[in-house]
Amino acid sequence: MSNLVKIGIRPTIDGRRLGVRESLEEQTMNMAKNLANFIAENVRHVSGDAVECVIADSTIGGVAEAAACADKFKRENVGLSITVTPCWCYGTETIDMDPHMPKAIWGFNGTERPGAVYLAAAMAGHSQVGLPAFSIYGEEVQDKDDTSIPSDVQEKILRFCRAGLTVATIRGKSYLSMGSVSMGIAGSIVDQPFFQHYLGMRNEYVDMTEIKRRLDREIFDKEEFELAMAWTKEHCHEGKDYNREPMSEARKQEDWQTVVKMTMIMRDLMEGNPKLAEMGFGEEALGHNAVVGGFQGQRHWTDHLPNGDFSEAILNSSFDWNGIREPFVIATENDSLNGVNMLFGKMLTGQAQVFCDVRTYWSADSVERVSGYRPESGFIHLVNSGSAALDGCGEAKLTSGESAIKPHWQMSAQDAEACLSATKWPPADVEYFRGGGFSSNFLTHGGMPFTMHRINIIKGIGPVLQIAEGHSITLPQEVHETLNERTNPTWPTTWFVPRLNDEGAFKDVYSVMANWGANHCVITYGHVGADLITLASMLRIPVAMHNVEESDVFRPHTWSAFGQDKEGQDYRACATFGPLYK
């Protein structure tokens, strides 16, 4: 990405001259510089690039300096701001008044000067003018010459930065619908007001005949196609053909060529390709400025042409024939809401995302009945034909040897090769996909932490978010095969157990499944529920269910004015302030 979003640091100060302000200048500006260094060392853009911080040219003692800072931030493409101070400052004269910029204030917990008093006064001002801000205040008192950033402050700063960068980076980008509504799936009825008002994004649309046109008229890079085909033949190994009448070799070779071309075409539709301009296709070379897209596929395409499973899976992975790269985000069946969750997960972590059907709840009794094996608890079968990134198999390893999905900038060629080797590509089940193609098939390693999440749109409320943190499990191979053969064995599988807390939707695994709001979900590697909650609060999307520890929930300070129950607070605050871009 060009012109990357920056993080603005606003050092505010007591404006009284002739001694007070002068005595605080160095400490206040050093606080800003230390914070900028900390962020630069610990936060990256989704592209893997380092984050740049922009500090105001001077400390901010009043409205004139606040305005000068705002002007600088506009010139520098600042997308979120953190105000820092060790002392009292003039509340509403010094706060960030940008209506769309996520904002936080870190008030130094020291006794010599009342940084906490300014923090409280500023939060009151933010609440009164209707611009929610995040309050950051360390639990332990620090000495005035202590330049360290306490661990609890660090955690909140990093969470705010990850979520705020997501908000600022997706603003102005596009969701690209390739096709329309798939099989009546609600998420593929693209809700333009949601994208516009909550995310600040626009919607772009192309009919699937545009992909067919580019196939027929060869509007793709032919040199890259030769490279891609050679790579695919070497690294993408065919799996078992479960069809009653196996596909012929000639048909399979034709399908391989088609799905590789489809992959290139979908990518070019999203982000453009200067090579197309060299070929005389200047309009096609521009793309649609899309950070997320969806492919309808079923059934108008897949009844006649090879399915999109290969294209979706490869694009969503962190590697292809061009090497390691940032994953794209493509939602199968054009489920735009699941696509948004995939985008959130990628933006927060830099990792490839796994799109899943929430397919089956298996109780311990049911597993024992059909396999003779009794697991420790019930679990959920997550499986989908299409856009599960190959990284989801867990073959990339941490230095400890544990299975993981890594940020793409940490992926190695060996990691990519391991994921490819663990994936088979069975010919598509023609009962589902009459036009042929191939589906990815892998099994996710057990013991991996995952966060399952999904946005749903509720009439009268708007978007709501669901979150379930948990982990993958490993079943004995024969048990896995017994259960997997009962559904479609050509698709990738993750056996998932959410973390329970004996309350509400998380009293047992069955209740998580029963309360899930749609047929699809995203699983993101790691326990990132707290980051998702912070992000949702910035966008004014309430959280319907989650199992994140209350101590990890970080929302704007003014949420505490909306009652005592945390989730009720969230709904009332989001309804009161409304979507970020209303």
Curated annotation (Swiss-Prot):
EC class (word): isomerase
Positions that bind Mn(2+): E333, D357, H520
GO molecular function: arabinose isomerase activity; L-fucose isomerase activity; manganese ion binding
Main localization (coarse): cytoplasm
Pathway: Carbohydrate degradation; L-fucose degradation; L-lactaldehyde and glycerone phosphate from L-fucose: step 1/3
EC number(s) per entry: 5.3.1.25
Known catalytic reactions: L-fucose = L-fuculose
SUPFAM superfamilies (UniProt xref): FucI/AraA C-terminal domain-like, FucI/AraA N-terminal and middle domains
Presence of keyword Isomerase: yes
Localization annotation: Cytoplasm
Family the UniProt entry places it in: Belongs to the L-fucose isomerase family.
Name of the protein in its database record: L-fucose isomerase
Organism: Vibrio vulnificus (strain YJ016)
